[in-house]
Amino acid sequence: MIADDQQPEVWVGHIEMDTDQLEASEAFMIALGMRAIFKTDDIAILELRAATHLVLVRKDQIEPSEASFDLMVDDLEAYHGRLTNAGITPSAIEDGRIHNWFTVRDPSGHGITVNSSHSSGLTV
């Protein structure tokens, strides 16, 4: 068992998303607040908190869908406002049972849910 003042031993290393618009998708993720760290003709890698990497993979054709991951922010309302001011069109904020949330669509049409934080307040 991990003590409250210790970091968990594991975290998510990589998540992946296909895109038919690599450059536009990379720019979109940067606008969401991710850090670009590596790019080739076929992939772009962006860094999130805890050193999780989003790997964008160029594909000729994709079927837009809901992302297999979601994002979390400390202040959902402020973040929603920042995205709106940046020209991104998030959905309205919805009240959920555990989180409040909204969605955005990346340039390839994938839906990405952004949740309010549920941090336990313990060391992570």
Report residues per predicted region.
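Active-site beta-strand termini and strand-to-loop segments that position acidic
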Residues: 46-51, 104-107, 117
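Core segments of cupin and vicinal oxygen chelate
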Residues: 9-10, 16-53
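N-terminal beta-strand motif that seeds the catalytic metal site of vicinal oxygen chelate
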Residues: 1-23, 67-69, 118-124
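Vicinal oxygen chelate
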Residues: 11-20, 60-86, 100-105
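Structural preference for long, well-ordered alpha-helical segments within the folded cores
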Residues: 27-31, 82, 108
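Conserved catalytic-core motifs of GNAT/GCN5-like acyltransferases
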Residues: 35-41, 94-95, 119-124
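A short linear hydrophobic-aromatic micro-motif
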Residues: 54-56, 89-92
